[in-house]
From Swiss-Prot:
One of its GO terms (cellular component) is cytosol. GO terms for biological process: dTDP biosynthetic process; dTTP biosynthetic process; dUDP biosynthetic process. Pfam families: Thymidylate_kin (PF02223). InterPro entries: P-loop_NTPase (IPR027417), Thymidylate_kin-like_dom (IPR039430), Thymidylate_kinase (IPR018094). Its EC number is 2.7.4.9. ATP binds at G7, I8, E9, G10, C11, G12, K13, S14. This is Thymidylate kinase. It is an enzyme of class 2 (transferase). Phosphorylation of dTMP to form dTDP in both de novo and salvage pathways of dTTP synthesis. Belongs to the thymidylate kinase family.
Amino acid sequence: MFITFEGIEGCGKSTQIALLAASLQQAGQRVLLTREPGGCPIADQIRSVLLDAANTALVPMAELMLYAASRAQHLAEVVSPALAEGVIVLCDRFSDATRAYQSFGRGIDRQVIETLNSLACDGISPDLTVLLDCPVETGLGRARQRIDSTSGPREERFELESLAFHQRVRDGYLQLAAEEPGRFVIVDATVQPAQVASAISDAVLSRLAVPV
């Protein structure tokens, strides 16, 4: 079972995916919590390039190919083996993030992205995608507050993008959800975290019949 979490910067994905993982584990499920870009040593090295705010010269097509390379390695090394063993895999971002950020956000042709995603994913697709939705002003406000309180290495290249960019990403996510309503569940990320967690648990229960 493969569940992915998506949303704009500052939507609360990391908090909510950890809460779901804990709930599933408490219910006796075997769970793997991972993320993209990253999730294994090689993919984490690629992540450091992709998210480093100093890498302003990174062009959209190179960015896209780095995401595809990271995904291919992560799937082969981490996700595919876990799924083969019957583990529930929870992934913070996956192929929909590439569609939202690199196609809707950057303007790369959707078919180019679908081709690369197909190669990188090798037939693996999520059973359920949780889209945490909030206004871009809310999400960026949270994200930048987090950055201001963080010390050490920072991964903020996307947080520094314009409001218009993030609006395109949000609109893209909502369009993707409309295209595949059977896979996506949209959760209001502006309410209290406990309410968000409850809505996610309900979605997992109703769509995948997993005790939470």
